[in-house]
Design a protein with these regions (language model features):
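Auxiliary Fe-S-binding modules of radical SAM enzymes
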Residues: 24-138
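Active-site glycine- and acidic-residue-rich loops that bind
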Residues: 9-23
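Radical SAM/AdoMet-radical enzyme domain recognition
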Residues: 1-6
Length: 138
């Protein structure tokens, strides 16, 4: 009954080779859930002066993790709003899950805005609460 979750933060100084290596290792480990976070530099922290990754780098990373981990739930997570900007909807072509409404250190996209974005793309929203409702009704 347990599932595994292990993720990454894109933009902390890793190379393309580093990303390929971690994507392959997470595949080898058969991780069930793979959150892909994007560096959101915060002033006063060790990486506070580092520029965040751009949209193209973020989308490439999501595509890499999707292609190397086809059975995993790829979760576009922290920093996606800032780093992807207007390209954020494109993340859903590689990711099949979003984190919304707040991360550990930064606010996140509001749930209603995320649902609207998903609807505009023609995707369906599934939530743990909706799944629980279906189980209770059976």
């Amino acid at each position: 009954g347990l599932s595994t979750c292990s993720g990454v933060i894109i933009g902390m100084g890793e190379t393309a080779e580093d990303l390929v290596d971690v994507a392959a290792e997470l595949n080898r480990l058969a991780v069930d859930s793979l959150p892909v976070n994007f560096l959101h530099p915060i002033e006063g922290t060790p990486l506070g002066d580092r520029p965040p990754p751009g949209p193209a780098d973020c989308l490439r990373a999501l595509a890499l993790f999707r292609l190397t981990n086809p059975r995993a739930e790829i979760r576009a997570a922290g920093g996606r709003e800032r780093c992807l900007g207007a390209a954020q909807p494109l993340a859903l072509f590689a990711a099949n899950s979003l984190f919304v409404e707040g991360y550990l250190t930064t606010p996140g996209q509001r749930r209603d805005a995320a649902v609207e974005m998903i609807d505009r793309l023609g995707f369906e929203v599934e939530t743990a609460a909706a799944e629980m409702d279906r189980r209770v009704q059976v």
